[in-house]
Design a protein with these regions (language model features):
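Gly/Ala-rich beta-loop-alpha elbow adjacent to hydrolase catalytic centers
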Residues: 82-90, 94
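Alpha-helix C-terminal capping segments
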Residues: 68, 72, 95-100
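Alpha/beta catalytic cores of group-transfer enzymes, especially the acyltransferase/condensing modules
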Residues: 96-254, 258-261
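Glycine-rich beta-strand-to-loop/alpha-helix junction loops that act as flexible
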Residues: 87-89, 181, 284-286
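Acyltransferase/transacylase module recognition
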Residues: 1-81, 225, 229-288
């Protein structure tokens, strides 16, 4: 089934095959089903171009997991979920799941084609940005143990940045991901560490009570600043490519924006699902 969706997406993307070929992703290097003990990806890609494979690769894995779940006995065809929620690029998984449940093969192919366009556009625009690097910094950093308000103040306090910094994902009240250029994120981490050091000094001097600030910052292993204004040009490129391929313009823009430029508020999404009547949540992973 997954291989069929990928093959169908090749046909959808025929009008932009030449553009995708410049990034060597006009045909995905996936072997499905993969031989026992082997991975499905037959060609390694590093740097920003990794997104051109990882975005559709994740969607393929999500669809495969959904199919496995139904074969294991969860009848989502007969007992359709109250709601679907996708974290970050999980919105693509949500849309392809809806298409698969509805038996709409054309829509499933279009959604998978969009995943390929989103990954390719993100990779191309990030590479062209030539953002400065700094040590082990990447394009996204996880920040735990810092409130919404404090993190916003620290981001806004930075004197200057080479590219826009944005709080890309709110995973909890004190767990966030910030997107931006690597050198700017390195400056942000240093600023957070200075604030934490000042807070510790105030506690040690008995000038402040309560729980001390103990932030944990970890660079994510990504080469693209998802959910960032830095990818506004990538969104425009997806719109352009989707129009050439005859993909529904509203669908293309909404899904691409959700992955490329729109911030994620995960607690708000879960609250919305609960308000729709959901009482059980089946976590499809990763790590589930």
């Amino acid at each position: 089934i997954v291989a069929g969706v990928i093959e169908a997406s090749d046909k959808v993307l025929s009008p932009v095959r030449r553009s995708l070929a410049t990034q060597s992703v006009s045909v995905l290097p996936f072997t499905l089903p993969a031989p026992d003990g082997e991975v499905a990806v037959t060609r390694e890609v590093a740097g920003p171009d990794e997104a051109a494979l990882s975005v559709p690769g994740i969607v393929a894995a999500q669809l495969g997991a959904l199919i496995d779940l139904t074969r294991a006995g969860l009848n989502i065809m007969g007992n359709q979920p109250t709601a679907f929620e996708g974290h970050s690029q999980g919105v693509l998984g949500v849309e392809i799941a809806r298409a698969w449940i509805a038996g709409d093969e054309a829509l499933a192919a279009s959604v998978f084609a969009l995943a390929r366009l989103i990954g390719a556009a993100a990779a191309r625009v990030t590479r062209r940005a030539r953002a400065p690097h700094a040590g082990d910094a990447t394009y996204m950093v996880s920040v735990r143990g810092v409130s919404d308000a404090l993190l916003t103040r620290i981001v806004d306090s930075l004197p200057s940045t080479s590219h826009p910094l944005s709080i890309a994902l709110r995973n909890d009240t004190d767990t966030h991901v910030v997107s931006g250029a690597p050198n700017d994120l390195a400056s942000l981490v240093a600023a957070i560490e200075r604030v934490a050091a000042a807070d510790k000094a105030a506690h040690d001097a008995h000038e402040r009570g309560g729980r001390p600030l103990t932030p944990v910052c970890e660079y994510l292993p990504v080469y693209v600043p998802f959910h960032s204004p830095m990818l506004a040009d990538a969104l425009a490129l997806v719109d352009e490519w989707a129009a050439q391929c005859g993909i529904n313009a509203a669908l293309a823009h909404s899904l691409a924006a959700a992955v490329l430029t729109t911030p994620v508020d995960w607690p708000a999404q879960i609250s919305a699902a609960a308000e729709s009547g959901a009482t059980w949540i089946v976590d499809m992973g990763p790590g589930a």
